[in-house]
Amino acid sequence: MRHGKAGRKLNRNSSARVALARAQATALLREGRIQTTLTKAKELRPFVEQLITTAKGGDLHSRRLVAQDIHDKDVVRKVMDEVAPKYAERPGGYTRILRVGTRRGDGVTMALIELV
């Protein structure tokens, strides 16, 4: 039985899932929006929202925690100095997922995930 096993495997091992989440989070925070599959967007959302909530702390410790997952210094700087203050009064829900149709090659549902 698969009870209590939250999360999606995305046909990857655990280190590849972490690498995918970090890479997509970096791209989303740099660009403001990215297009990906619906399943990947649903997995990315809590990862990014936790990063932004951590960044809202605003201190050195918060910056170092964000830098553990975002390895691009420019993106870390942007998250700490621009993104986190923007959502200072917002208690969560920093991202939005919009369906944008299906991919022609394999018919998978595509989605646009963006910062609100």
Curated annotation (Swiss-Prot):
The gene is rplQ. It comes from the Bacteria. GO terms for molecular function: rRNA binding; structural constituent of ribosome. HAMAP family: Ribosomal_bL17. Pfam families: Ribosomal_L17. Gene3D superfamilies: Ribosomal protein L17. It comes from Deinococcus radiodurans (strain ATCC 13939 / DSM 20539 / JCM 16871 / CCUG 27074 / LMG 4051 / NBRC 15346 / NCIMB 9279 / VKM B-1422 / R1). Keywords: Ribonucleoprotein, Ribosomal protein, RNA-binding, rRNA-binding. GO terms for biological process: translation. This is Large ribosomal subunit protein bL17. Coiled coil: none annotated. GO terms for cellular component: cytosolic large ribosomal subunit. Belongs to the bacterial ribosomal protein bL17 family.
